[in-house]
C-alpha cells in the first residue's frame, strides 16, 4: 500500500509530522497551518494515514487496528528521514491517540509530542460526551438523535440534519457550517466512513458497540 505525504518548508531541527483526526479524515483541515507555521520557520509534513485522504483505501477491516497504524507511522518516519534530533509529532483528535501509542513504543525516535483535542482515555471521552456535551443540547433534539441511534438509522439524512447545527457547529467547528473553510468541507467530503465506524463507532456520543478504540485507555 502507498500513503501520501507533503512537506511544507525546510528546517533541519524542527520537522512536525501532522497526525490527522477521524479516523479516516485526512489532512485537509490542517491546511490553515500554511498561513502561519512557515512564517515561524517551522517545517511541517502532511500525512494521510492508510485509508484516508489521498492515500490508498483498502477495504479489509482487519487493517483498521491501532497497532498497525503505529507501525505504519514508524515506516513513514523512516521514509521521511526524521529522527530524535528533529522529529515532532502533532496529533489531533484520533491523531492524539495514535501519537500517544507511537510515543510509548517508539519514543526514542521523538524530540517532541503535541496532543490537541484528545483525552488519554476512550471510556472517559465517552462519559464526557454523554454526561457533559449531550446534556448541553436541546432535550427534544437529543431525544430524536438517540431514537435514531437506537434504531441504527445512522444513514438517515435527518440524523445529520440534527447533528450539524446541534453538535458539529458547537463542538467541531464553532461557526455556522455555511461559513466553514473550503479545506474543512473538502476533508469532510472525503472521510472514510467505513474506517471511522470500525474504529470510533457510528455515534458522536462516545465510542461504543464494536468500535476498536472503545476500551483504549492510557490515563
What residues fall within each predicted segment?
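Alpha-helical elements of Rossmann-like donor-binding domains used by nucleotide-donor carbohydrate transfer enzymes
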Residues: 32, 68-75, 101, 166
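Short aromatic-enriched loop/helix-cap "lid" or pocket-rim segments at secondary-structure transitions
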Residues: 30-31, 56-59, 124-129, 179
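Structured segments of extracytoplasmic/periplasmic soluble domains
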Residues: 36, 76-79, 105, 170-173
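Alpha/beta-hydrolase
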Residues: 143-218
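Conserved HGGG/HGGXW glycine-rich cap/lid loop of the alpha/beta-hydrolase fold
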Residues: 4-57, 62, 77
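Flexible "cap/lid" loop of the alpha/beta hydrolase fold
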Residues: 113-154
Amino acid at each position: 500500500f502507498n500513503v501520501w505525504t507533503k512537506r511544507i518548508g525546510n528546517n533541519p531541527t524542527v520537522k512536525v509530522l501532522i497526525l490527522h483526526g477521524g479516523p479516516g479524515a485526512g489532512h485537509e483541515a490542517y491546511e490553515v497551518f500554511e498561513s502561519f507555521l512557515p512564517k515561524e520557520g517551522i517545517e511541517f509534513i502532511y500525512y494521510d494515514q492508510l485509508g484516508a485522504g489521498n492515500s490508498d483505501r483498502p477495504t479489509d477491516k482487519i487493517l483498521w487496528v491501532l497497532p498497525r497504524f503505529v507501525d505504519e507511522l514508524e515506516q513513514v518516519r523512516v521514509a521521511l528521514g526524521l529522527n530524535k534530533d528533529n522529529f515532532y509529532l502533532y496529533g489531533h483528535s484520533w491523531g492524539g491517540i495514535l501519537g500517544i501509542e507511537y510515543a510509548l513504543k517508539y519514543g526514542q525516535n521523538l524530540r517532541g509530542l503535541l496532543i490537541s483535542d484528545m483525552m488519554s482515555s476512550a471510556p472517559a471521552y465517552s462519559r464526557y460526551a454523554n454526561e457533559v456535551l449531550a446534556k448541553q443540547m436541546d432535550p427534544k433534539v437529543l431525544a430524536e438523535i438517540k431514537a435514531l441511534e437506537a434504531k441504527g438509522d445512522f444513514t438517515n439524512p435527518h440524523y445529520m440534519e440534527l447533528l450539524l447545527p446541534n453538535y458539529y457547529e458547537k463542538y467541531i467547528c464553532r461557526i455556522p457550517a455555511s461559513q466553514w473553510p473550503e479545506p474543512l468541507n473538502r476533508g469532510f467530503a472525503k472521510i472514510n466512513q467505513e474506517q471511522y465506524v470500525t474504529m470510533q463507532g457510528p455515534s458522536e456520543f462516545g465510542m461504543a458497540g464494536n468500535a476498536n478504540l472503545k476500551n483504549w485507555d492510557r490515563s
